[in-house]
């Protein structure tokens, strides 16, 4: 089977947005306009195509990124292949967003025309910035009360620190929103609002003529800056043609120099087709972005893999899903080469071979079996046993490890126990399966109480895990009160000289270590050896590091993992017969226990960035309540009919906040919360925590 579409005609992109910015509706419209869906599913009635998991449909939020392949004929009449990855907009699922951004070539950031740039938009934007993903902005919900296109554009600059390149102006707003002024071709596009209706093209309305001229001039000035020749011509008074302008906008977008901004309303079917045309005109194909780099397993050199069918096969597993019909599905982005059903793949991270059974092309939740796939494709593989998120699969003869994904540490823990004996065994299987799908979800066993503890990114995250366990694995469980994932650290340097000696007939044990423990700015553990003259033989030094690392998971105050510790081995002593790696491990462990106390151990707690959007009447109550939760108010900001309150609040004081806020504002205020940083716990609170966990 030969390649159906040239790789230059692929667009792998995602839609990123704050919860409720209309992302699912937009994806539905795109699938409808590109001919995949016959009946549009509205999120309001829980029938949306992309939201294929039951709970997503109930809660009206998108959780898992489902990959969908569809097609669109561009302005030039040529058909392109779109692989759309749906990303969740809720804060507890930033991990999903991170995974999808990792395998995208471009993205559309969706803004709510009334709210503009919201906190989750900022978070996702920063993640996209990290991977240098070219982005366009679509100001959605232009038909909504309080819709303000120009304020949204201003916020792209002020809140995201990004350069907005305005390509369209709205004609009317709120109920009177009719269409857009296209600044590239200087024309008006209007829609009657019926599903699938094409735009009618007309002259720019006279009251917008002057504004359109002004914005087109700004557009040209920004676009020519990306090319020296175009800049020179422009300064000499030569204007770029429409085709040249499109090429300049494409170049600047792909180089992430600016972000094209369009507008419309997906729900009312206005502005969707020009957005699809813009995906083709301005977002990159797999060959327009830098080739992915990785490490050659044989030589350990850095290598790149070009987006070409002739290059050695390399693909990245970015998502694992349980499918009721096929079992476990591993979603992969093919970066280079081609893959056929039935071949052997090397998993270079796990150092295991995988045999490829079925290969599927996914459309939301229908699927099509395929025999072969090529560079640039996004496919779902069935039957892989060892592969987890972030692993590289490649040609066994040309092994490579692509860049690893990094996942955040969970901030909240809950004890969970099966309701019946029958649920006991099934619960373990279910939790392990769910943890394989989601690297930000962890399962562990509490050694003292024997309880199973699940940890995640927030209350909603863990709610949904428990819910999925019930639905997909038929496991009923009781859950305890959420607990905060505290951490411990040290505040000053301490030098410990410790000798471990044991004589018990025959060979004894002997090891002496002198270690300086001190705090450092990062969260990780740093070990350094400054041993000179063989005071501790080289082969024993790894034992010292291993010994310290083995007790880093349990701090001296309340047994929480330690953060930000640096240990420097400066001196020591050994015995020719009695010393061993194990003896040095034991000595280092004891030295750390002493050192952590002497170095001023302290408890740390997760601090959450909280944003509350509330009607003005309740601002005083909201601020008073946040203060009572040990919150620090960092600012308030007025938005059309509501006020935004920003604060930093300890997670320990935010449990059950949703109910308090609801009753305080008669259900009219909303909030979002995400982990920001760790901070020392006030001493009075720290004592209570120590008593509780001692």
UniProtKB/Swiss-Prot annotation:
Pfam families: EFG_C (PF00679), EFG_III (PF14492), EFG_IV (PF03764), GTP_EFTU (PF00009), GTP_EFTU_D2 (PF03144). Its main location: cytoplasm. GO terms for biological process: ribosome disassembly. PROSITE patterns: G_TR_1 (PS00301), G_TR_2 (PS51722). The gene is fusA. GO terms for cellular component: cytoplasm. InterPro entries: EFG_II (IPR041095), EFG_III (IPR009022), EFG_III/V (IPR035647), EFG_IV (IPR047872), EFG_V (IPR035649), EFG_V-like (IPR000640), EFTu-like_2 (IPR004161), G_TR_CS (IPR031157). Residues 8-287 form the tr-type G domain. One of its GO terms (molecular function) is GTPase activity. This is Elongation factor G. Catalyzes the GTP-dependent ribosomal translocation step during translation elongation. During this step, the ribosome changes from the pre-translocational (PRE) to the post-translocational (POST) state as the newly formed A-site-bound peptidyl-tRNA and P-site-bound deacylated tRNA move to the P and E sites, respectively. Catalyzes the coordinated movement of the two tRNA molecules, the mRNA and conformational changes in the ribosome. It is found in: Cytoplasm. GTP binds at residues 17-24, 86-90, 140-143. Keywords: Cytoplasm, Elongation factor, GTP-binding, Nucleotide-binding, Protein biosynthesis. The keyword Cytoplasm applies. Belongs to the TRAFAC class translation factor GTPase superfamily. Classic translation factor GTPase family. EF-G/EF-2 subfamily. It comes from Bartonella quintana (strain Toulouse) (Rochalimaea quintana).
């Amino acid at each position: 089977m030969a390649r159906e579409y040239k790789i230059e005609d692929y667009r792998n992109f995602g839609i990123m947005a704050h919860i409720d910015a209309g992302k699912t509706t937009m994806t539905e419209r795109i699938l409808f306009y590109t001919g995949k869906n016959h009946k549009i599913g509205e999120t309001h009635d829980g029938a949306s195509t992309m939201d294929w998991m039951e709970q997503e449909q109930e809660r009206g939020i998108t959780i898992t990124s489902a990959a969908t392949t569809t097609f669109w004929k561009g302005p030039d009449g040529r058909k392109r292949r779109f692989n759309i990855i749906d990303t969740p907009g809720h804060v507890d699922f930033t991990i999903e967003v991170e995974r999808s951004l990792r395998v995208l070539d471009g993205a559309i950031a969706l803004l709510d025309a009334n709210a503009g740039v919201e906190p989750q938009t900022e978070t996702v934007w920063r993640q996209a910035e990290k991977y240098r993903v070219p982005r366009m902005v679509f100001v959605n919900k232009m038909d909504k009360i309080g819709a303000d296109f120009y304020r949204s554009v201003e916020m792209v600059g002020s809140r995201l620190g990004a350069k907005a390149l305005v390509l369209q102006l709205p004609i009317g707003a709120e109920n009177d929103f009719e269409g857009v002024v296209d600044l590239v071709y200087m024309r008006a596009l209007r829609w009657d609002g019926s599903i699938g209706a094409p735009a009618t093209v007309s002259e720019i309305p006279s009251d917008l003529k002057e504004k359109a001229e002004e914005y087109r001039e700004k557009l040209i000035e920004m676009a020519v800056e990306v090319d020296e020749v175009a800049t020179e011509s422009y300064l000499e008074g030569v204007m770029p043609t429409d085709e040249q302008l499109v090429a300049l906008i494409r170049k600047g977008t792909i180089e992430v120099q600016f972000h094209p901004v369009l507008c419309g309303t997906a729900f009312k079917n206005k502005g969707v087709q020009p957005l699809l045309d813009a995906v083709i005109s301005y977002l990159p194909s797999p060959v327009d972005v830098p080739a992915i780099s990785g490490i050659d397993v044989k030589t350990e050199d850095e290598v790149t893999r070009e987006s070409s069918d002739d290059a050695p096969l390399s693909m990245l597993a970015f998502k694992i899903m349980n499918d009721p019909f096929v079992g476990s599905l591993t979603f992969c982005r093919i970066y280079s080469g081609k893959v056929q059903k039935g071949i052997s793949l090397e998993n270079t991270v796990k150092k295991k071979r995988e045999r490829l059974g079925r290969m599927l092309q996914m459309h939301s939740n229908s699927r099509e079996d395929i025999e072969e796939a090529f560079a640039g494709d996004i496919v779902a593989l069935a039957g892989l046993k060892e592969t987890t998120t972030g692993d590289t699969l490649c040609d066994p003869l040309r092994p490579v490890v692509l860049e690893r994904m990094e996942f955040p540490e969970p901030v909240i823990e809950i004890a969970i126990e099966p309701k019946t004996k029958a649920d006991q065994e099934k619960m373990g299987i279910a939790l392990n399966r769910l943890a394989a799908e989601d690297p930000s979800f962890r399962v562990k066993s509490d050694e003292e109480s024997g309880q199973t503890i699940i940890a995640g990114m927030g209350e909603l995250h863990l709610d949904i895990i428990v819910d999925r366990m019930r639905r997909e694995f038929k496991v009923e469980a009781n859950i305890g009160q959420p607990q905060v994932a505290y951490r411990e650290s040290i505040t000053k340097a301490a030098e410990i000289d410790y000798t471990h000696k044991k004589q018990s007939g025959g060979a004894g044990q002997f090891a002496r270590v002198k270690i300086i423990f001190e705090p450092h700015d990062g969260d990780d553990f740093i070990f350094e050896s400054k041993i000179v003259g063989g005071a501790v033989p080289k082969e024993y030094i790894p034992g010292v590091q291993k010994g310290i690392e083995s007790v880093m998971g349990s701090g001296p105050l309340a047994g929480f993992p330690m953060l930000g510790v640096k240990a420097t081995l400066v001196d020591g002593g050994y015995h020719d017969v009695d010393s061993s790696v194990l003896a040095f491990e034991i000595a280092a462990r004891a030295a750390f226990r002493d050192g952590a106390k002497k170095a001023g151990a302290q408890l740390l707690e997760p601090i959450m960035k909280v944003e509350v959007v509330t009607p003005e009447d309740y601002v005083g109550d909201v601020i008073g309540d946040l203060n009572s939760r040990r919150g620090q108010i960092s600012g308030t900001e007025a938005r059309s009919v509501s006020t935004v309150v920003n604060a930093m609040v300890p997670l320990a004081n935010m449990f059950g906040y949703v109910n308090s806020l609801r009753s305080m504002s008669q259900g009219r205020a909303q909030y979002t919360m995400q982990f920001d940083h760790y901070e020392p716990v006030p001493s009075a609170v720290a004592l209570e925590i120590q008593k509780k966990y001692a």
